[in-house]
Amino acid sequence: MLKAYEFRIFPTKEQEQFLHKTNGLCRLYWNTALARKQDAWKNNEKWNIGTAKKVFEECKPEAIEWCNEIDSSALAAEWNDITSAFNNFFKSCKGQRKLRVGAPKFKSRKYSQVAITWTSMAKPKILKNGYLFLTRKLGPVKGTFHRWAEGDFKHATIKQTPTGKWFVKVCVDKKPEPKNTNGKSVGIDWNCRDEDFIVMSNGTKVKCPRFLQRSSKQLSHQQKIMSKRFVKGLETQSSNYYRQKQKVALLHEKVANQRKDWLHKLSRQICNEYETVVVEDINLQTMSKMNHGKVVGDQGFGMLRNMIAYKGNLVRVNPKNTSKTCHCCGFTNPKVKVGVNYWECPNCSAKHDRDINAALNILFKYNASQGIVGRERAESTNACGAPSSAVKHEVFISSFESFGSE
């Protein structure tokens, strides 16, 4: 399995200048290849990445004097990215990809962030004095390394965040880590309308802290100040504007780190308790373009799904009629609309909480695909309409509820 390790690094001013030069040349490589492709398409000529590379190699010494100072491994990785971008675009046009991929675009010098990848030709290692050695031209880089990446090295990426911090991501190929094998499975229903973030088939409801909403007033205040300091028509803004822009970026970074930390803890606790986690196969990209776009981004359900996928066993099922179907008898009630949170089955008179019922149906769909067929009527229901047999009062559940109250 491929695993990435991220470390904070502290390059010197000379090393920062080298990284910016490398990023600039990689951007020129990308834009040159894209320009050659567009010219070939207009003239009905055959074109490939190798042809554009040869054309650029001929004019490279005349275009940039310091091009020979750049590491060739970073340029090789850039060509791999160009090839992948065009291949993904062509596959998307032919319908060979699930998600739509747009055509590659030119990279702007003004708005592009520093992100440089080195291929397997580089051999990163940690020196005894706590420095990272990636390439000879870059030299040893000071960093914070709590642990090192174990496995076969694939590639490394150095990037600079909008706040000016530098990080290195080392991707390695290692043996899969042992996962939970206790045989337990749980269904999870995602809720973007109410306070409950996810509802589990065992009756657990997890509230989302909504970190972006908590910081919205402070963020709005800082963004207004930044907007007032922006002068339209100026190519280079004032120092006060860039300082204020840094403050806004720091706030966004804090919110993102809070959300990521909370989701890591939540996903780890779910995977420790259950071997299989079943969720609905929802297109979050479409959901984000609707009325709940800001909530979808603030909750981070897509990030939670990805975390569960590599920490445990994630299964996606068809979300059709999960809220309208009675988990006791299987009757589909067409009267259950979006705003109905509690309803009674007209067929078996069972009372349901909309989200818990949906989570149970999600789990039933997975069980049916595994050959476990049949629905059992619960002996009794609780105040919310959830089957008493499905609500487990464990220490594990109370710790979940504590996530939303922090």
Give residue ranges: language-model regions:
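Generic detection of short hydrophobic beta-strand segments and adjacent strand-loop junctions
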Residues: F7-I9, G139-R147, V206-C208
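Hydrophobic (often cysteine-bearing) scaffold residues that line and stabilize catalytic clefts
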Residues: Q15, T22, C26, D71, ...
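Short, surface-exposed charged micro-motifs
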Residues: R8, A115, K123, H155-T157, ...
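Long, hydrophobic, amphipathic alpha-helical segments used as structural scaffolds
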Residues: L34-K37, W41, F86, F90-R97, ...
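Gly/serine-rich nucleotide phosphate-binding loop at the start of the catalytic core
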Residues: M1-A77
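Positively charged, helix-rich recognition surfaces that bind polyanionic ligands
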Residues: E150, P162-E406
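Acidic carboxylate diad motif detector
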Residues: T51-T161, E253
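Stable alpha-helical structural segments in soluble proteins, enriched in small hydrophobic residues
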Residues: A33, A77-F89, I356-Y366
